[in-house]
From Swiss-Prot:
InterPro entries: CCDC162 (IPR040401). Keywords: Coiled coil. The gene is Ccdc162. It comes from the Eukaryota. Residues 1-35, 220-276 form a coiled coil. This is Coiled-coil domain-containing protein 162. It comes from Mus musculus (Mouse). The keyword Coiled coil applies.
Length: 912
């Protein structure tokens, strides 16, 4: 394709072509695979299938729209005619689609767990373990990479490795068989593997998750448009100058992002396509890292349990919301200046929602940072626990009375220094074992090889056992001697310390006595203070108990007082009601009596006037009204008295409570004052001790200062010598570095030469294979020609053979006239048949050569003659007439007699 171009330009053009073709192939393959996820395979196998494509998963319209959007994306580039820019955009599109499908599958697992759909979760989890890794950017090593591996610091994906070791980098990620071009495309199989075990309902849920992730990508792109516009010019130059690792061509698939009109308009117009795809790629990578860290953090919080059930997922969600989500959202709201609004939103809603105006990138970044902080804190705590554990073990071993290692418990019992080593019977045992299976033949003694080897092996074991026992005994003896000397040395050191302490001057002794007496006085005062505190506490407890009892009885008295008041009120009410009822009854009786008196007066004719009766009734009514008024006033007076008593009791209870609180505060203030006094005395004592310690430290510092001045001079001299050594070492290191760099350069040159030689050898091998193929074709042609020649020669030889047979038959007829006289008809018929067959073979050699074995067998029967023909005569005729035909005739006769009837005489059988 690019043979007319120079080598470098042809290589670059071929690389760009492969990049474009690989990316476009994966995009189209993903488009069809995505449509097949919701449709039956027969819709794509048959061009005129009656089953229509489902539009939920794209369908035919979705495939067409996807390809149109892809063309629009390429046209919206700054330089759509530049193949490198187009290849870069297609590669980013493919990577974004890969990460989008991966994020959708991970979110689908969380959705199934949150809904409690355990079978669907198990199916997707088991299938994704096999389906997602081939779709990711995992390394696929070749079977030849073990022989030609990359050096250790280099990464197979780095441009440096691809530039220095292109073939080895290709083998590190080119699949198991990188040279074979007929590797099947497993993209559709891997996508279907992730969703193969789902039902129709669960498959619709999966489709909803895919669409949801797609809409989330559109929201991220719309929310970050200003960032893309701002950094478009800077990133474009960096992306143009960057050389991506094009050796990695994993099977990826297209993005469904631009199906939304807003996102497509964004990609086409205002924002740069490459910047948009780069932003989406970074967001998806951030999301994947967050999901992986969430899974690891959840497993750590749940003590190593996998989150594979609804209960565990609920526990994980609660822990994550409390420890990660809420702090991260609160920090984000604080950064945005909306902390109060966030708190109000948290109070109004039960769930944790992000603050208004926060983008998805900021939300996930905050969660990722919080997860990393939590994991770092956990790691630091684990390290601190381990350090504390080791320190406790170290201190426990150090605090033992005997400074011996813990290996002493595995040692033997204590032995004395004077011991004697027993002489092992090694030689005697060896001789005894050797002579057990020996054969004595007088002056010679023979042994079997296996027996001798076994005896030598046992001898070696005995010798090693003796050496080990000697080592153990001597080491124990030396260790016990050292332990004894150490004990004696420690005793001597203790005696020396006691002597030094006994020789302390009198001033120091007086100071020590004063300090001891002061300490004793302080202890006595502290004990007295504690005793007084205890006595006061005892009194306070008694008073408090009395007050509690009084309060309890006071409450009872108040309750009784209230009940008495209520009973008295009820009695007053009853009395008032009773008086009213009695008055009413009296009034009624009086009215009835007056009425009766009036009636009697009317009947009997009384002489008194009615005015007196009227005055009496008026007076009685006034008296009744006054009595009612006085009774109401008495009831009000009783109520006022009871209310006043109740108020007085409440005020007394309130004042008693204030008095008890004031007493408690006074007691606490007294305790605090006493504690402050004790603390002041203790601080004074501590300051006095610190002053003495400072004086002693000052004297020690003066002595140490003199020593340090002396050591400084010696260290200065040593430092000069060390500087001289360091300079010499630096010179030698520089020389070694120069030698190493030169050696590395030589090694790199050798490696490049070897790679060039390897490429030349591979080219020569290909050329040799081509030459071998050409030679094979030439040999096939020569073989065909030889077969044709042999067929012709065979036909000629068969003609000659027939002629020889005719001559032999004529000779036989001449020599045996009696036989000829006996059967002339049969012989003539045989001769005629042989002549006719010979003539037909001579005229049509190729047709007769392809006949079946039946014709050959007939011909062989005709050729057979009686055995009475003289052998010498036959040999003379054969040797004299046709010597070259003899072997072929015998071979033909033998094959005709021994071959089965189903095998035909073909030229291939004779040519071989």
């Amino acid at each position: 394709m690019f043979k007319s171009l120079p080598e470098e330009e042809a290589f670059r053009a071929l690389t760009l072509t492969l990049q474009l073709v690989a990316s476009l192939h994966d995009i189209v393959a993903y488009t069809f695979s995505f449509a097949k996820l919701g449709n039956c395979p027969a819709c794509f196998d048959l061009p005129l299938s009656p089953n229509p494509l489902m539009r939920d998963w794209g369908g035919a319209e979705g495939i067409g729209n996807e390809l149109q959007e892809l063309q629009k994306m390429i046209d919206s580039l700054q330089r759509p005619q530049d193949p490198s820019q187009v290849a870069q955009a297609l590669l980013l599109r493919r990577e974004v689609t890969l990460l989008q499908f991966d994020a959708a599958m991970r979110h689908l697992l969380r959705t199934f767990l949150a809904a409690g759909n355990a079978p669907a979760y198990q199916s997707v989890a088991e299938s994704a373990c096999y389906g997602l890794p081939p779709l990711s950017n995992a390394l696929g090593k070749s079977i030849f990479s073990s022989q030609l591996s990359l050096p250790q610091p280099l990464d197979p994906w780095s441009p440096q490795a691809f530039a220095l070791f292109p073939w080895r980098a290709f083998l590190e990620d080119g699949g198991p068989f990188p040279v074979i071009s007929s590797v099947p495309d497993t993209l559709e199989y891997d996508m279907q593997m992730c969703l193969c075990g789902l039902s129709d309902c669960d498959r619709r849920v999966a489709h909803g998750e895919l669409v949801g992730v797609q809409m989330l990508m559109e929201d991220v792109l719309l929310g970050s448009c200003h960032v893309i516009r701002k950094a478009s010019t800077e990133w474009q130059a960096a992306l143009d100058n960057a050389q991506p690792d094009w050796s990695k061509l994993p099977g990826l698939y297209p993005n469904q992002l631009e199906s939304h009109p807003k996102a497509s308009a964004l990609l086409e117009g205002q924002c740069d396509v490459v910047m948009s795809l780069s932003l989406l790629k970074s967001f998806l990578i951030l999301w994947k890292r967050l999901e992986v860290l969430k899974e690891h953090w959840g497993r750590f919080k749940l003590r190593g349990q996998d989150i594979n059930s609804a209960l565990l997922h609920r526990q994980f969600s609660e822990l994550y919301e409390a420890e990660i989500l809420y702090p991260s959202m609160k920090a984000l709201a604080r950064q945005m200046g909306k902390e109060d609004e966030f708190e109000e939103l948290m109070l109004r809603s039960q769930s944790i929602l992000p603050p208004k105006g926060a983008s998805e990138i900021e939300i996930k970044t905050q969660q990722l940072q919080k997860l990393l902080e939590s994991l770092e804190i956990h790691m630091i705590q684990e390290v601190l626990r381990k350090v504390n554990r080791e320190m406790t073990l170290f201190l426990s071993e150090k605090s033992k009375e005997e400074s011996t290692l813990p290996t002493d418990r595995w040692k033997h019992q204590v032995m004395k220094e004077n011991f004697s080593v027993m002489r092992p019977q090694i030689v005697e045992r060896f001789v005894q074992r050797l002579m057990e299976d020996s054969q004595d033949d007088g002056p010679k003694i023979t042994f079997r090889r296996e027996h001798l080897e076994a005896c030598i092996l046992s001898l070696g074991c005995d010798v090693m056992a003796r050496e080990r026992s000697n080592f153990e005994t001597y080491s124990m003896c030396y260790e016990h001697i050292l332990q004894h000397t150490r004990q004696k040395l420690s005793q001597k050191e203790q005696e020396v310390d006691l002597l030094r302490r006994s020789q302390v001057p009198s001033e120091d002794c007086a100071g020590q006595v004063a300090e001891l007496s002061h300490d004793m006085i302080m202890e006595i005062t502290a004990l007295r203070a504690q005793l007084t505190d205890l006595e006061e506490e005892n009194l306070n407890l008694k008073i408090q108990i009395r007050k509690e009892v009084q309060e309890e009885y006071r409450e009872l008295v108040q309750a009784l007082f209230l009940t008495c008041l209520r009973i008295k009120e009820k009695l007053d009410e009853n009395q008032f009601n009773l008086i009213q009822k009695v008055c009413e009854l009296i009034g009624e009786v009086r009215a009835e009596g007056i009425a009766n008196v009036k009636q009697l007066k009317k009947t009997w004719g009384s002489a008194r006037p009615d005015e007196e009766t009227k005055e009496n009734t008026a007076k009685e009514q006034l008296c009744a009204l006054e009595q009612d008024h006085s009774s109401t006033l008495a009831a009000l007076l009783c109520k006022a008295r009871s209310l006043g008593r109740w108020r007085l009791a409440v005020q007394q209870a309130h004042l008693r409570g204030q008095l008890s609180r004031a007493e408690m505060e006074s007691i606490l203030s007294k305790k605090e004052c006493l504690r402050i006094k004790l603390m002041a005395e203790q601080e004074a004592a501590l300051l006095h001790q610190q002053l003495l310690a400072a004086r002693q430290a000052l004297t020690k510092a003066q002595t140490d200062n003199r020593k340090l001045w002396r050591q400084n001079d010696t260290q200065a001299q040593l430092l000069r010598e060390l500087e001289h050594r360091v300079t010499q070492d630096s010179v030698t290191r520089q020389q070694l570095d120069i030698i190493k760099t030169s050696g590395m350069e030589k090694l790199l040159k050798d490696v490049e030469q070897k790679e060039q030689k390897l490429q030349l050898l591979t080219e020569e091998a290909e050329r040799a294979s081509k030459r071998g193929q050409l030679q094979q074709k030439k040999m096939d042609r020569d073989l065909k020609q030889m077969r044709n020649r042999l067929a012709q020669e065979r036909s000629v030889k068969l003609d000659a053979f027939q002629r020889v047979q005719e001559l032999q038959s004529q000779l036989y007829d001449i020599q045996w006239p009696s036989v000829q006289m006996g059967s002339p008809v049969g012989l003539r018929s045989q001769t005629h048949c042989s002549l006719s067959s010979a003539s037909t073979l001579s005229r049509h050699p190729h047709h007769h050569f392809s006949k079946t074995h039946f014709v050959g067998s007939k011909m062989t029967r005709r050729i057979q003659r009686p055995k009475t023909v003289p052998v010498k005569h036959n040999r003379r005729i054969e040797d004299g007439s046709l010597p070259s035909v003899k072997e072929n005739v015998q071979l033909t006769t033998f094959q005709a007699q021994t071959a089965p009837s189903g095998i035909s005489f073909r030229p291939e059988s004779f040519s071989s």
